[in-house]
């Protein structure tokens, strides 16, 4: 993705950087609306996730994470913007008339052909089981549970690496640095997710952040004691504690929050680096 820098004509464009525009013209049978989605509220209207609300209305695109059109070649017809994720999506026309969206692999262009199955070429955009891939293959959209669809390495620029195969399991190095075991029968897509330069974008102004449905974040140290454990004091006072905490008094910034004795602990060979 090309990054375009703004000229400093207004304060909001100063040091601004945006990606190249990709239009979106979704198919009606592959989209549907979502009511009360992304506002950070539960069914009772109570805030359960802070700093969310507003934003532009969105239509959800049905993405084919399972890639279960086996041994049927498909052609990339469009590359579109998806407001629900930072990666682009591709519209695929399969030979049997089926039309589906998939994540856009890096380097894929309109007119390329992809296929999924057990004995397919190791080329960008093709989906196949891990047992049929050579070591060192760069992959994304990786299944954890067989047949459930890809759940790992789906963000823009994400890529994992197949580093070993032994017995019924394959060893993967994930984008976070975590090394874990996954069944060799699980499927993955060859290549890296596109839109790699998304982290180089600079929104430039607060309004652009609000369009994304993200509200302002207020520091706890400037609140009152009734609102946050860090609040209170005269002037610019420190937090008054040995370690920072969340608004509800739980340890923050470094405390491990993963549950103990989780079923997947035995599958993680090396934890992600912080």
Curated annotation (Swiss-Prot):
GO-annotated cellular components: chloroplast; mitochondrial large ribosomal subunit
Pfam families: Ribosomal_L2, Ribosomal_L2_C
Family: Belongs to the universal ribosomal protein uL2 family.
SMART domains: Ribosomal_L2 (SM01383), Ribosomal_L2_C (SM01382)
Protein name: Large ribosomal subunit protein uL2cz/uL2cy
Record's subcellular location: Plastid, Chloroplast
Annotated stretches, region: Disordered: 1-23, 223-274
Keywords recorded for this protein, A-Z: Chloroplast, Plastid, Ribonucleoprotein, Ribosomal protein
